Curated annotation (Swiss-Prot):
Keyword Membrane appears in the UniProt entry: yes
Stated name of the protein: NAD(P)H-quinone oxidoreductase subunit 4L, chloroplastic
Subcellular location: Plastid, Chloroplast thylakoid membrane
Transmembrane segments: 1-21, 31-51, 63-83
Domain of life: Eukaryota
Catalytic activity: a plastoquinone + NADH + (n+1) H(+)(in) = a plastoquinol + NAD(+) + n H(+)(out); a plastoquinone + NADPH + (n+1) H(+)(in) = a plastoquinol + NADP(+) + n H(+)(out)
Topology of this chain in the membrane: Multi-pass membrane protein
Species classification: Eukaryota, Viridiplantae, Streptophyta, Embryophyta, Tracheophyta
Subunit structure: NDH is composed of at least 16 different subunits, 5 of which are encoded in the nucleus.
GO BP annotations, alphabetical order: ATP synthesis coupled electron transport; photosynthesis, light reaction
Entry similarity comment: Belongs to the complex I subunit 4L family.
Plastid as UniProt keyword: yes
Gene expressing this chain: ndhE
Length: 100
């Protein structure tokens, strides 16, 4: 069971990294970042249950990471929406935000 969960977490993490590197759309990049965080959460819960199933430290930390990821997604989408309203595009390669 441990191997299957870790392999799934590695696949999710790899897909997220690949999508983040090759993404040209800001919304897609945010979704890939969320996929990476979910892969990390899966590994946290898996290791927590494998090493000591009586303590819920990994589960609690995973809930904390989910809360932080939700806040990050809300702030990220608000920034993308503001950029879209000003520039009418969400493509990453069209921007130099330091001049914005």
């Amino acid at each position: 069971m441990l191997e299957h969960a870790l392999i799934l977490g590695a696949y999710l993490f790899s897909i997220g990294i690949y999508g983040l590197v090759t993404s040209r759309n800001m919304v897609k990049a945010l979704m890939c970042l969320e996929l990476i965080l979910n892969a990390v959460n899966l590994n946290l819960v898996t290791f927590s249950n494998f090493f000591d199933s009586r303590q819920v430290k990994g589960d609690i930390f995973s809930i904390f990471v989910i809360a932080i990821a939700a806040a990050e997604a809300a702030i990220g989408l608000a920034i993308v929406l503001a950029i879209y309203r000003n520039r009418k595009s969400t493509r990453i390669d069209q921007f130099n935000l330091s001049k914005w």
